[in-house]
Regions:
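Gly/Pro/Ser/Thr-rich low-complexity, intrinsically disordered segments predominantly at protein N-termini
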Residues: 1-190
Length: 190
């Protein structure tokens, strides 16, 4: 579905929405279920269309994560993560304990969030990374869909900073701190 974004109200106050209001609009058919957007501090933010390279990396990474994750973990693919009553994000992947239902996942439950970025690199490494940290997501990977280099964010801080951000080359092995069973070399994905 194509979404028309506007900046007509730039500089003017805008109405803020809650997660509950957005869910009600989706349930009522006002917003289509397949519409790609996130809610950030009450503001609806349309997401960029995904290009070929993004989809290639995402498909290969999906196979690896599903194959390697332990049975006590759930792998969400473009699942909404409700961080507070005015914010939800939709990472490409999210790993969290299986005992938690998808709609109940909160920031501190997320062991690993992964964003595959092509045109959204600045947004994913900037604003979204700060939001994930502020809400206690334990680890964030932002993968460059072109080069497959990955920025690994660990030790989230309540002020939205990360204690560590390391750029890892595509040839190096990535292993999330909270999951012993998962390791990936982005260069091996095809």
């Amino acid at each position: 579905m194509n979404v028309i974004a506007t900046r007509a109200a730039e500089g003017f106050p805008r109405r803020s929405f809650t997660v509950a209001e957005i869910r009600a609009m989706v349930d009522a058919g006002i917003i289509a279920e397949d519409e790609n957007f996130e809610l950030i501090d009450g503001e609806v933010v349309p997401m960029s269309p995904k290009g070929n390279q993004h989809e290639v990396v995402k498909a290969a990474l999906n196979i690896e994560l599903a194959r390697q994750k332990s049975d006590d973990l759930r792998l969400g693919i473009e699942s909404s993560v409700y961080l507070d009553d005015r914010t939800f994000l939709e990472p490409d992947f999210v790993l969290y304990p299986k005992r938690i239902l998808p709609e109940d996942v909160r920031g501190a439950d997320v062991l690993l969030a992964i964003e595959v970025a092509a045109s959204s690199m600045k947004y994913d490494r900037g604003l979204k990374a700060r939001i994930y940290a502020r809400h206690g997501v334990r680890e964030l990977w932002v993968v460059d869909a072109q080069t497959r280099a990955t920025w690994v964010h660990t030790r989230p801080q309540p002020d939205g900073q990360w204690g560590s951000i390391e750029k890892v080359s595509a040839d190096s092995k990535l292993a999330p701190g909270a999951m012993e069973t998962v390791s990936v070399r982005m260069a091996d994905l095809d």
